[in-house]
Every structure is written in C-alpha cells, then in structure tokens.
Amino acid sequence: LEARLDRVLPGLMAEYDAEMWVLSMREYAEDPVFWSVVAPTTFAARRRSIYVFTRRPDGSVERLALGGGTQGGVYEAFRSSRPVSEREGDGEGNAELWGNEQWWLFRELVEDRDPASIVLNIDEHQAFSDGLHAGEREALERALGPYVDRVVREPRLAVDYIAVRVPEMMPRYREVEETVHAILSRAFSNAVVTPGETTTDDVRWWLRERIR
C-alpha cells in the first residue's frame, strides 16, 4: 500500500494535473478506490472516511485522513485543535470527526491548502471513477462552498491508480495465479467430472462452492 501511494500516485496526480484528490464515503457505501488506498485488514469505511491527497510543490503527495484511521501510519490523521464542549467532542475537549465537525475540518483543510483543482470521483462512463455517492456529493459540495468551482472530473486518475501495480506485488499475484490454475485443473478432472453425467452447471456450482 505505502509503495503504491509513494511511487504511483504522485506521478498520476502530476500527469493529470490534480492538485487535490478527495475520496469521501460512508460505512458500507465505499468508493471502488477504497480497497486500493487502505490496509488489507480494513474491510469498510468508518462512519464517514475522508482521504485527501494533496500534491506538494516538490511533486510529493500529502496523505491525510479525516476519519478512517491512519492505516498503520500510511496517512496522517488530520485533527482539529479547536476547543469544543464535551457534549460535542470526545470528553477531552477534542473535536470528534463525525457530522458537521468533520465537514468543518475538511473546509479548513481545503482553505489552507488552496488547491487550483480538486478531483472528485464523478463520471458517467467509468464505474471505478464514479464512487462518490449522490448524498455524499451533496454534503461534500456544501462543505467546499466557493471551492466547488475548482472541482474537476478526471476519471483516469482513479482507474489508473487501481490498475497500476508495483514490483513488490508480483510474487503474490503469481501465488494467486497458481491457485486459480489448481482449482481449474481439478474442476475439469475426473475428481469432479463424470463423463455422461456431469453437466456444465454442475461444474459451475462446484467452482462457486470451491472459491467461497
């Protein structure tokens, strides 16, 4: 994960002239990109998870999480230092990242970074680039305020980030390939197929049951 974010994302954001990329989603309504930007032990967004990627002048990318955790230190957890009442916060005077407080903090971040372009995952053609749900988009655009005029659609950013692999991933892919070949070999062997009796549907169901 860290290798992809370190080596793949900066080049893509530069190529597509994206100064900021925002991924915002709610629990069990994740963006398709979600599983490519979080640790493998993270199975769902946390209430609302907002990940913000900002391109720095030197070409590197700042990675901030506004809810959703740091994913083992891959992200910096962006927190507000503004005092809030115990009722609104976590009991210790710190703002809890949920609801309006989360959006206010997001607005602070955008104002501070002042990006010329903000990429959101909205696209009518590419499913992998259309992960911003309708209600989430409305809330996000309200939070952006005047910065909504800087929103751009760049579907290639999400698609290419999901698609590009780094060398460290290849050994695992070879293991997956070996597993697939082993399953297919058994599916079409006499261990599963009885000539004259076994149907193609039988084989399909065997495969479904085997991989679940």
Where is each model-derived feature located?
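A composition/biophysics-driven feature that prefers long, compositionally simple stretches
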Residues: 1-212
